[in-house]
């Protein structure tokens, strides 16, 4: 069904290290992690990187069964340079790429009508309901179209993303979905929305998505090798195809915690990050959604002095996570192997609450 596109950086970016106490954590940070693993509070973790103020505080890798976009690749002993499926964390990175391309004048602004970017599908855009759609709706997954990736598992061809991948024309499949809710009012998780963004970026820049990402984001950050899995149509999957080492994912988080800059160079416009991290719609009672990024709050401290601290997040199937806590300049990258399981969300949240936040002083 899919093949990877290899892409190698001009040179890996190094990390400086800090002891937990030097970075404002309790000295037993690693011991807390070991206890969580031993007590089976967390399971099937493959990699964990915790960084603060641009320094690596905790890095740990395990051995486990892994898959590359559903293809069983066997049992893997993970290391610092082992690339891993990011699954839908890819979506959030594509959201950053859109902002970079916008600053270059290569893609339309969020307020632009969606179908202006898809003239080959003017027959679909003639529908009055679809004609109301803008790129703002696409970026915030609030298109209001008939799309289901949440109640139908990815192992079922009726899942909308899987159906898209098997469609002879992925973009027609996405764009012909009926508008069933008012755009901009409701969040519907949609890999199709991100696929549209990937197409607009590639068309506007004249560069395949994976090559554009390497030029404007991965190489400027000094990231190591990556792969970007492509679909049956040889198009890189903007929704879920990126494979990257956790260290490199954490470096993207560090850049975000630094306001979009890295080593004095502007990578992502600060104005775009403000839009990414401004809530547009609610996902559920606890999470909001901006432009391809999840937004929420963690409880920090103990009553009566407990307070809420915001986080920005990128989430992927199996327990892949990138958390950025901007107030503390903390970045946490997690890879795991709990693909397609109903409790896959549990280990990452326990790592955050019982290890990282519980150790913060």
Predicted regions located by residue number:
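N-terminal leader/targeting segments and the immediately adjacent pre-domain N-terminus
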Residues: 1-73, 102-108, 140, 163, ...
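Active-site Gly/Thr loop motif
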Residues: 224-226, 277-331
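Active-site SXXK
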Residues: 54, 82-110, 138, 197-201, ...
